[in-house]
Regions:
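Short, compositionally biased leader-like segments
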Residues: 1-13, 110, 117
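Short, basic/aromatic recognition patches
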Residues: 9-24
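Short solvent-exposed loop/turn micro-motifs enriched in small/polar/acidic residues
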Residues: 26-28
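Short beta-strand scaffold segments in enzyme catalytic cores
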Residues: 30-37
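Zn2+-dependent cytidine deaminase-like catalytic core
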Residues: 44-129
């Protein structure tokens, strides 16, 4: 049986929707994330900043933690949207490695004129643990 192609454009569009909910009152760096489960549910996340900066959460971890807390544990793809199609931070890379495994990671900007498709191995060649 052939593996069905992932509709990454829809996933990116959903990450753009999530980005609109970002709370980035200090950095004004808004990020949205859309995580596709193995049963085709899309879980959204956005970055949420705090004056106590270490309490800030990235969009990727918000989406992943939300999915895990809802009982999802198998995933097909993740899309992350920021102004410059930024790569995930170190802690997000580690969480992607631990909980999502080897799935495509799509990085884009709101105009969707730049799309990078990466693997966690490319982003985190030497994971912790």
């Amino acid at each position: 049986m052939m593996k069905k192609e992932i509709n990454y454009k829809n996933l990116i569009e959903q990450a753009i929707v999530a980005r609109n909910n970002a709370k980035a009152k200090f950095s004004n760096f808004k990020v949205g994330c859309a995580l596709l489960t193995d049963n085709n549910k899309i879980i959204l996340g956005c970055n949420i900043e705090s004056a106590a900066y270490p309490s800030t959460l990235c969009a990727e971890r918000v989406a992943i933690y939300s999915a895990l807390s809802k009982g999802y544990d198998k995933f097909k793809a993740i899309a992350v949207v920021s102004d410059c199609a930024a790569k995930p931070c170190g802690p997000c890379r580690q969480i992607i490695y631990e909980y999502l495994g080897d799935i495509p990671i799509f990085l884009s900007n709101p105009k969707v004129d730049k799309i990078d498709k990466l693997t966690i191995e490319e982003l985190l060649p030497y994971p912790f643990g």
